[in-house]
């Protein structure tokens, strides 16, 4: 929910933030969900699928192969399911995810979400887990960056 609010309010063209998202699956079960999000990206539906995967986690998390559940979600958000199914088996998705995760490891990422502002990881305090807390950090960093640029 916090990520959705941040994307809606800050990740806008010409806005104060450049929103960059990297794949960083933490558990075996999250790897196929990450692939599903990348396949949705091919149809311009990355964030819709991402948000749906989290909203419907109970429908897929305990399945050995959750691809059927992801196809159902793809259908629910208006995707071409034939194209989506074909994408789920592409090897380049695995390579892309592993490279993205390694990039995160190289930056010191140990969990999700991890948020960087002006190249620095935002500490995971109680403030980090609320929209208002993150908004306050963003505004403080934006003000500091503006002052430094004067």
What are these regions (language model features)?
Residues 1-10, 71-150:
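C-terminal cap of thioredoxin/glutaredoxin-like
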Residues 1-75, 80, 139-140, 144-149:
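Structural alpha/beta surface segment adjacent to cysteine/selenocysteine redox centers
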